[in-house]
């Protein structure tokens, strides 16, 4: 199992949690972004900078991910693609996306996108709560313990 992090929009506190888990377990972890993501110098923790552009980082993750890998992302279409390749997807808020839940999440995302396109203000996501941080860390630990 490898960890792939969609680091373009990953909150710093979640990146720190991922780094601690990778250090503790020794799992191979790569942060993929279109900007420099500072990571500690460890043999198993890497940063991969891709060119700026729409979905470039996402496409690179999809290209490299393998079955049973774990992708950390809050990007619903990316989660759908990696799940279809046999990988797992976990949001930075601690939601584990599955084959059973991802289609409903895509439908909600598309509906909200349609509303925004028609001029309706939908607002952004709430700030990451302490409960969501804990939920993320707990899910990550459970997944890594099963590998």
UniProtKB/Swiss-Prot annotation:
InterPro entries reported in the protein's UniProt record: UPF0178
Family classification: Belongs to the UPF0178 family.
Name of this chain's protein: UPF0178 protein VIBHAR_03247
């Amino acid at each position: 199992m490898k960890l792939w992090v969609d680091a373009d929009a990953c909150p710093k506190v979640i990146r720190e949690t991922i780094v601690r888990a990778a250090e503790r377990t020794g799992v191979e972890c790569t942060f993929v972004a279109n900007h420099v993501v500072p990571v500690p110098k460890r043999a198993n923790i890497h940063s991969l900078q891709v060119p700026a552009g729409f979905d470039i980082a996402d496409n690179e993750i999809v290209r490299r991910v393998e079955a049973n890998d774990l992708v950390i992302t809050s990007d619903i279409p990316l989660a759908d693609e990696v799940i279809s390749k046999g990988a797992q997807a976990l949001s930075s808020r601690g939601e584990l996306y599955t084959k059973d839940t991802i289609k409903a999440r895509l439908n909600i995302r598309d509906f909200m996108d349609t509303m925004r396109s028609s001029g309706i203000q939908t607002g952004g996501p709430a700030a990451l709560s302490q409960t969501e941080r804990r939920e993320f860390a707990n899910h990550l630990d459970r997944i890594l313990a099963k590998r």
